Regions:
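N-terminal periplasmic accessory domains that precede
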Residues: 96-100, 144-147, 162-167, 179, ...
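Periplasmic-side early beta-strands and strand-to-turn transitions of outer-membrane beta-barrels
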Residues: 263-362
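Outer membrane beta-barrel strand-and-loop segments of large Gram-negative receptors
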Residues: 415-437, 571-577, 583, 592, ...
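Gram-negative outer-membrane beta-barrel transporters
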Residues: 602-605, 623-712
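C-terminal beta-signal and adjacent terminal beta-strands/loops
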Residues: 549-550, 605-608, 612, 708-715, ...
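Short, acidic, small-residue-rich periplasmic hinge/interaction motif at the N-terminus
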Residues: 35-41, 47, 77-81, 94-137, ...
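Outer-membrane beta-barrel translocator/receptor signature
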Residues: 187, 202-204, 215-290, 296-303, ...
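Short acidic/polar hinge/loop motifs at secondary-structure boundaries
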Residues: 63-66, 183-210
Length: 788
């Protein structure tokens, strides 16, 4: 691990020292313009790079770069925008050049046939959605899963109001990779109630890659990838500071998140910047329409520090380090001491006792600490392309606490408290990762390529009485190649990857359970290919087919104990084989200045699909109480569906949006529907926006949204503990703007009203739907105050 990081640093330093200017040079003046609808504005902080030089545009969108009097390929890129490459012939006498850049809009596809998509995403024909900073600002303070719910095809697996896990086209956890600051987020993500340990206040941009992404990102991206990009660090001399405040009425949550950004430029035109942010949150018990959900409060304390040094010659090195700490209560109504009360609670559908509002967090509960360090370096290499190296380290400390212990007499309160104060299960996960890729390799005039290698070393240690998974050490290695062939109106893409994973399991023995020392080895290949065709000026057709695999995870093989967060007893299966998937995605995109839509079809065929499903006939009775039993199994299955998203804008200020998704999942082994497949849903919104409203508010908006969720009528009645809940309709209002004048000038605020009818409902993907309803009406106030 340490040798690998040293090797990456050695390659980085040697490549910098090898850069030489060739021949005579001249100065090229570059301007960058931001195009959105009918406006053209200068665009700052655009990275301009040749094979041996580079620059960053200033606030006016200008930059000067030295180029040799030979043929030059100049690339331009900026997070959230479609980049590209242009070739300057040796015979050119041009002294100025203008780049026009289009933003990757929220829900819009970041696809343009004339752009160099390989330098951004790898497989150019894949389906990509972008959530920009401006949209994220309107949802700060919610969980990552809640923030993502408005993306078509994305749902959330909810475990109470504080735990929300993204589900993309029916897949989550081991099949959906979440990348944070350039490295895969590793934090016991196999648990359905283990939400990503990411501070939503510190996110700059979110990119959602739909469909099989295993070629570039490995087996964990079988169902797609969610890429979390921290805020930009400006390469200009600056000092900025702001404070974001947020409050919610349902659980009386309060949050504060101050940030500070500083940057400078040196005489050499090198640039250095730092950004720091701290977030604190506290929330009490959440409320449904009729009652309080006992012990659902939580606290968070998070921090993030970023730094970036950009060389005038085009190289850069940056780091991100973050700390995430949370303590959250687990709904008391889900932990029940005996089998009869468990069945009665499921039959009643509401808690067996009433609770009052409080900020106190009692047992059962979870405490999670997550530390992350990411170091990334980029180097343009003459005649090859752009070399990127990433080193990552993460440490995850998860403690889960019991609420019951039947071995202790009911009148021995002191003894019970002494036992419960220690975690029933504590998991310590440390992960090292290293990735090197060479991208934008210009094979010839039409073909560009990316090659890369990746590695990961992971160790898991267990403490406590509960032994859900054993101790293990895991090594993963992978190598891949991706190529894009670009014609005038079509891009053809393809790629291949091979991975090997080795898992060493430590011996474990109890009177009822034995795990011997063992080494598990898995290997497999992934392939992907497709095209993006510019059918008309405003219409594009994309198709992608991928074949991916993933090895079984340790929890799927060895689980045999209580999983406290989900309040269920989970049993693994040791003879599971690798899971394989063949995915077909087709998307039609249409985009003009006032009408845009995106229609997608997808089909996933699984060989050896690994699933966790209830064994309703045999609830498990333990000394900690009675719990529903869930078992891992492997079947043949298929998932398929359709998604639609469209916008119609009237007079550039009023927009009507419509989006919907439908997914079907079938267990081909039994002939029954798959368990926990998201329900069909349709959402439509009316959004009004003004650059200036009454000369008081700038960027003012108001939005009314209605979401319709259909009852899931495709289920196996002999499998689950209760039938799916009825469908429901939710109505939300969101409004806000920025104050233009006076002592409060520059303050941005928005107000959200969720579930304004205070509807009593249950979502099929809620882990607590057996015991309680979802939350009722909620009012959210957000305010960002600029300090410097």
């Amino acid at each position: 691990m340490y040798y690998f990081s040293g090797f990456v640093l050695f390659i980085f330093l040697c490549s910098i020292s090898a850069q030489q200017l060739v021949g005579q040079t001249r100065t090229l003046h570059i301007s960058t313009i931001h195009i959105q609808q009918h406006s053209k504005k200068p665009l700052a902080s655009v990275r301009i790079a040749t094979y041996n030089n580079g620059a960053m545009t200033d606030a006016a969108g200008h930059a000067d770069i030295f180029i040799s009097n030979t043929e030059q390929a100049i690339s331009f890129s900026k997070a959230g925008y479609i980049g590209g490459t242009i070739t300057i012939p040796a015979s050119s006498n041009d002294t100025s050049l203008t780049f026009t850049m289009q933003p990757m809009e929220f829900q819009g596809k970041a696809v343009q046939v004339t752009g160099d998509r390989n330098s951004v995403y790898g497989i150019a024909s894949q389906d990509v959605n972008i959530i920009k900073t401006e949209t994220l600002d309107k949802h700060r303070g919610q969980t990552l899963g809640e923030t993502l719910k408005r993306v078509t095809g994305l749902h959330t697996l909810q475990t109470g109001p504080s735990i929300s896990k993204p589900v993309l086209r029916g897949m989550h956890s081991q099949r959906l990779l979440i990348s944070n600051a350039g490295i895969a987020q590793e934090g016991q993500q196999w648990g359905s109630e283990h939400a990503p340990e990411i501070d939503a206040f510190s996110i700059g941009t979110i990119e959602i890659l739909k469909g099989a992404a295993g070629v570039e990102y490995g087996p964990g991206a079988m169902g797609g990838m969610i890429r979390i990009i921290p805020p930009d660090i400006a390469d200009t001399a600056h000092l900025h500071s702001s404070i974001t405040l947020q409050s919610q009425s349902n659980n009386w949550q309060g949050a504060i998140s101050p940030s500070l950004s500083w940057g400078t430029r040196f005489i050499s035109n090198d640039a250095f910047g730092l950004r720091a942010q701290i977030t604190a949150k506290q929330a009490g018990n959440a409320r449904t329409t009729d009652y309080v959900l006992g012990n659902t409060g939580f606290t968070e304390l998070n921090g993030q520090l970023q730094g970036k040094y950009s060389f005038s010659s085009g190289e850069s090195i940056q780091f991100t380090t973050s700390s995430f700490d949370t303590e959250l209560g687990i709904f008391k109504g889900s932990h029940i001491s005996n089998a009869s009360d468990l069945l009665r609670a499921i039959e009643l559908g509401h808690p067996l006792q009433e609770y009052d509002f409080t900020y106190d967090i009692d047992f059962p509960k979870q405490q999670i600490k997550h530390r992350l360090l990411s170091i990334q370096g980029t180097i343009p290499i003459q005649g090859l392309g752009l070399l990127e190296a990433t080193y990552g380290w993460q440490f995850n400390d998860r403690s889960e606490f019991d609420a019951h212990n039947l071995r202790v007499p009911k009148d021995s309160t002191f003894l019970l408290e002494q036992l419960l104060v220690k975690p029933a299960m504590r998991l310590l996960l440390e992960t090292y990762s290293g990735d090197i890729k060479l991208k934008s390799i210009q094979v010839d005039e039409l073909i560009s390529a990316t090659i890369g290698i990746s590695s990961q070393f992971q160790q898991n240690k267990r403490l406590g009485k509960v032994v859900l998974i054993p101790d293990y050490f895991m090594t993963s290695l992978g190598a891949y190649v991706i190529a894009n062939m670009m014609f005038d109106d079509i891009i053809i893409s393809g790629g291949a990857r091979f991975d090997n994973r080795s898992i060493s399991i430590d011996r474990f023995s109890t009177p009822t359970r034995l795990i011997n020392d063992s080494v598990l080895n898995y290997g497999g290949a992934s392939f992907s290919g497709g095209f993006m065709w510019q059918v008309l000026d405003h219409m594009r057709l994309a198709m992608n087919i991928g074949n991916t695999w993933r090895p079984p995870q340790v929890n799927e093989l060895y689980s045999y104990d209580i999983h406290h967060g989900t309040a269920q007893f989970e049993i693994g299966k040791r003879d599971l084989s690798p899971e394989k998937s063949t995915t077909l995605d087709i998307a039609l995109l249409y985009d003009t200045h006032n009408i845009s839509f995106d229609f997608s079809l997808f089909h996933n065929q699984f060989d050896g699909f690994i699933l966790l499903q209830p064994d309703r006939a045999r609830p498990t009775i333990t000394v900690r109480g009675s719990f529903p039993t869930f078992r891992y199994d492997q079947v043949q299955s298929v998932m398929y569906g359709a998604e639609f998203q469209g916008d119609y804008t009237v007079d550039d200020w009023l927009t009507f949006s419509l989006q919907g998704s439908m997914i079907r999942g079938d267990n081909l082994t039994t002939g029954n529907p798959l368990f926990m497949i998201p329900s069909d849903r349709i959402s439509n919104a009316l959004h009004a926006h003004r650059e200036s409203f009454l000369d008081v508010f700038g960027d003012a908006f108001i939005e009314f949204r209605m979401t319709l969720v259909r009852m899931q009528n495709r289920f196996d009645p002999n499998l689950d503990y209760t039938n799916p809940p009825p469908g429901y309709s939710l109505y939300d209002i969101n409004l806000g703007g920025t104050i233009l004048h006076g002592p409060l000038k520059g303050i941005s605020a928005n107000l959200s009203f969720q579930n304004i009818t205070n509807l009593a409902y249950r979502d099929y993907l809620s882990r607590y739907r057996y015991f309680a309803m979802d939350t009722g009406f909620n009012c959210i106030v957000r305010m960002t105050i600029p300090i410097l």
